[in-house]
């Protein structure tokens, strides 16, 4: 496996291809949100299971959270992130269904990994 820098990984992401990167738990397969169908197809993932959207800080992901869940999201995120916790939470109605599972939920996480957070900060997007 080649180890590449964040800028090379970002170029791959911008070309619509997935990357594998380390997190604080297991390696992640990631892509830009607009290419999320790639992950469902690549992993043969059931559409009933939400994908995990990662960011470098919890405020980055607040717009993906349904209005009814924002208070709980902020309370839990500020206490447990960065870290290994993935929140499965109702997705904002503003977000496209391409990012959500069939039940309109989304997994959100801020990994406690310098490399993962650097990649997300550099890209100014979420993976």
Regions inferred by a protein language model and the residue ranges of each:
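Active-site-adjacent structural elements in enzyme catalytic cores
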Residues: 1-126
């Amino acid at each position: 496996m080649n180890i590449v820098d964040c800028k090379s990984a970002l170029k791959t992401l911008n070309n619509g291809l997935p990357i594998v990167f380390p997190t604080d738990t297991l390696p992640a397969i990631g892509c830009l949100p607009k290419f999320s169908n790639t992950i469902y197809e690549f992993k043969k993932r059931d559409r009933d299971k939400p994908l995990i959207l990662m960011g470098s800080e919890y405020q980055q992901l607040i717009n993906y959270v349904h209005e009814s869940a924002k208070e709980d999201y902020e309370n839990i995120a500020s206490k447990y992130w960065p870290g290994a916790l993935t929140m499965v939470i109702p997705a904002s109605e503003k977000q496209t269904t391409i990012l959500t599972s069939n039940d309109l939920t989304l997994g959100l996480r801020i990994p406690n990994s310098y490399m993962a957070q650097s990649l997300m900060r550099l890209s100014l997007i979420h993976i």
